[in-house]
């Protein structure tokens, strides 16, 4: 009986100790990590040369609304989207909007990428999407893939496949 009494008393003392306001602060739940390329994920760090040999990096994009476009010369929907992105770049560029196109290089180009861009009237930076770049953006499941990041560098829209310029502009306007 005495042994039970001591056991209950010990458990009670230790149990109350856990409720002490002066005990170590409660652990905060760990924030769930968001995978690259998922809504809410940050703009990955990158530094690449564009097709003209100019350096382009994520550091250059701080504080801007950013549209990242993964494309290929053989991709018909990409060819239809890029002139619209150029129009948005011309319209909103002065307000802190940037566009970077990453050429998906897993298949043979149907034409020289620089000539392709010139023919479409694209003046925003275009670079090659190496395996490392594609990984940093969470992998690319299809072309075109468009990602829109807000001024804080957080992914707020991801579209796989063709999208009309007007729909993209509706995403951009509140961010700019």
Predicted regions and their residues:
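A short beta-strand-turn-helix
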Residues: 37-40, 45-66, 89-92, 135-137
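Conserved redox-active cysteine motifs that mediate thiol-disulfide chemistry
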Residues: 62, 70-87
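Thiol/disulfide oxidoreductase modules built on the thioredoxin-like
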Residues: 115-123, 128-173
């Amino acid at each position: 009986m005495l042994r039970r009494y001591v056991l209950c008393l010990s458990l009670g003392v230790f149990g109350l100790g856990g409720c002490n306001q002066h005990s170590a602060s409660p652990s905060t739940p760990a924030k769930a990590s968001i995978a690259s390329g998922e809504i809410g994920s940050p703009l990955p760090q990158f530094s690449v040369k564009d097709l003209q040999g100019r350096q382009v990096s994520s550091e250059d994009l701080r504080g801007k609304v950013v549209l990242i476009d993964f494309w290929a010369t053989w991709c018909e929907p990409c060819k239809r989207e890029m002139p619209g992105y150029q129009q948005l770049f011309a319209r909103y560029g002065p307000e802190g909007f940037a566009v970077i196109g990453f050429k998906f290089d897993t298949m043979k180009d149907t034409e020289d990428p620089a000539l392709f861009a010139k023919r479409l009237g694209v003046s925003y930076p275009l670079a090659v999407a190496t395996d490392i770049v594609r990984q940093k953006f969470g992998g690319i499941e299809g072309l075109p893939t468009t990602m829109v990041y807000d001024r804080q560098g957080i992914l707020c829209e991801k579209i796989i496949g063709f999208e009309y310029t007007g729909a993209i502009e509706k995403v951009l306007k509140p961010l700019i």
